[in-house]
Amino acid sequence: MKKISAFIVFVLIAGAVSAQRDLAYKWSVTAEYGLSSLDGDGDSYIKQVYGTSVEYAFLPFAGIALDYYYFPLGGPAFTTNVNAASVNLTVNVNRLFFLDTDYKVILKGSIGYGIAGYTSKYISSTTPSQTSVSNSASSFPVLSVSVEYYLTKLFSVGAKSQFRPFNVNNLEGDPRYNLDNVYNDNIVGATLYLRFKFSNPD
């Protein structure tokens, strides 16, 4: 937590120092598609993931993004549908260190807080029974790293990896995993995305 707090403070201080520069405030939206998997207690398949995001760049190297993802997870004994959203601080690493330099390829990172609603269906392998669970969860820190390539001044494409830890232990819906004070369910994903900018980059 101290390292995360120090990182956020560093970004804000750097923003204040460069605030006198001619800043470009931009909105952008993305559409994403890729693969994801549940890192939980049981075996999990690699499944598809769909997502979208809206980002506001309040500094040339930093922004606030709101994202939404649909994760249709599954495994040999369960199916789980997760609707997840998060608000994130995004950082353009290239511009953080070289503010006045333009790049065709950029490296971005983000950290955020998320919430999710999910429905799980578990089928027992030992008895002919089925368990369904609907619940909510929170995620912190939601982490992502992406590489983005500018096609034009308005469009870019990218590849993103993300990690979402949850404050629950039973996204599979298996009653055996209903343990107190155990939080080890995570979603990992990799997506390709298309970004549209409403105003030209610097």
Task: Walk through the language-model features, giving the residues of each.
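Flexible, surface-exposed loop regions and adjacent strand-edge segments
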Residues: 46-47, 81-84, 124-130, 174-181
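Cleavable N-terminal export/targeting peptides
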Residues: 1-24, 197-202
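Transmembrane beta-barrel strands of outer-membrane/channel proteins
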Residues: 29-35, 66-70, 109-115, 147, ...
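Extended low-complexity acidic/polar segments
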Residues: 52-60, 121-166
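Short glycine/proline- and aromatic-enriched beta-strand/turn motifs that initiate or cap beta-hairpins
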Residues: 19-55, 63, 118-120, 197-199
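Predominantly the C-terminal beta-signal and adjacent terminal strand-loop region
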Residues: 65, 72-82, 150-202
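Outer-membrane beta-barrel domain signature
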Residues: 39-43, 76-78, 98, 130-135, ...
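Gram-negative (and chloroplast) outer-membrane scaffold detector with strong preference
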Residues: 56-127, 136-140, 188-200
